[in-house]
Swiss-Prot record:
Residues 1-50 form a transit peptide. Signal peptide: none annotated. One of its GO terms (biological process) is reductive pentose-phosphate cycle. It comes from Flaveria pringlei. It comes from the Eukaryota. RuBisCO catalyzes two reactions: the carboxylation of D-ribulose 1,5-bisphosphate, the primary event in carbon dioxide fixation, as well as the oxidative fragmentation of the pentose substrate. Both reactions occur simultaneously and in competition at the same active site. Although the small subunit is not catalytic it is essential for maximal activity. This is Ribulose bisphosphate carboxylase small subunit, chloroplastic 6. Heterohexadecamer of 8 large and 8 small subunits. One of its GO terms (cellular component) is chloroplast. The keyword Plastid applies. InterPro entries: RuBisCO_ssu, RuBisCO_ssu_dom, RuBisCO_ssu_N, RuBisCO_ssu_sf.
C-alpha cells in the first residue's frame, strides 16, 4: 500500500525531468571514412636489430632486467641516475646463497618471494650522484665477490620500494 505523501512526491519528480527520447541522429558527429594507407607510417628502413634475450633453459631469473645480458658499469650508472632523478633513496643488498626466488620464509604465491637479503651498510640518504653508489657497489663486490648484489630505490615519502635490479652476480651465473 502506497501512502499519499509518497505518491505525491513521485508525481512532482516526474514533472521536473523531461522524459528520455533516445539518441540524436549522427548529424552532430561528422565522420569521414578513411582508407587504410600504410605507406605513410614511419619506418626504420628495414634495419631492425633486436637484442638477444636470456636463454630460456639453464639460466635462473633473478629480478628486474634479469632477462638481459649483464649490465655494464655505464648502464648501471644510468639506472642509478634514474632512481636519483625520481628522488628515491639508493640502497645495496647482497645475498650469498640464493639470488633467485627461493620460498623459505613464506610459502604463499604472489609478490613476496620469501627471500631476505642482507643490507650493505645503511640506505644512502642524501646521495645525489651515481658515482657514490657505484663506489659502494665496488666495495661490496670486493668484500663478497661470490654474492648476488642488487641496487634498490626506496621512496621515503610513500615508504615503498620502487626499483630493484641485480648489479652483480657470482661467476657462472
Amino acid at each position: 500500500m502506497a501512502s499519499i505523501p509518497a505518491t505525491v512526491a513521485a508525481v512532482a519528480q516526474a514533472n521536473m525531468v523531461a522524459p528520455f527520447t533516445g539518441l540524436k541522429a549522427n548529424a552532430a558527429f561528422p565522420v569521414t571514412k578513411k582508407v587504410n594507407d600504410f605507406s605513410t607510417l614511419p619506418s626504420n628502413g628495414g634495419r631492425v636489430q633486436c637484442m638477444k634475450v636470456w636463454p630460456p633453459l639453464g639460466k635462473k631469473k633473478y629480478x628486474t632486467l634479469s632477462y638481459l645480458p649483464n649490465l655494464t658499469e655505464a648502464q648501471l650508472a644510468k639506472e642509478v641516475d634514474y632512481l636519483l632523478r625520481n628522488k628515491w633513496v639508493p640502497c645495496l643488498e647482497f645475498e650469498l646463497e640464493h639470488g633467485f626466488v627461493y620460498r623459505e620464509n613464506a610459502r604463499s604465491p604472489g609478490y613476496y618471494d620469501g627471500r631476505y637479503w642482507t643490507m650493505w651498510k645503511l640506505p644512502m640518504f642524501g646521495c645525489t650522484d651515481s658515482v657514490q653508489v657505484m663506489k659502494e657497489l665496488q666495495e661490496c663486490k670486493k668484500e663478497y665477490p661470490q654474492a648476488w648484489i642488487r641496487i634498490i630505490g626506496f621512496d621515503n615519502v610513500r615508504q615503498v620500494q620502487c626499483i630493484s635490479f641485480i648489479a652483480s652476480k657470482p661467476d657462472x651465473f
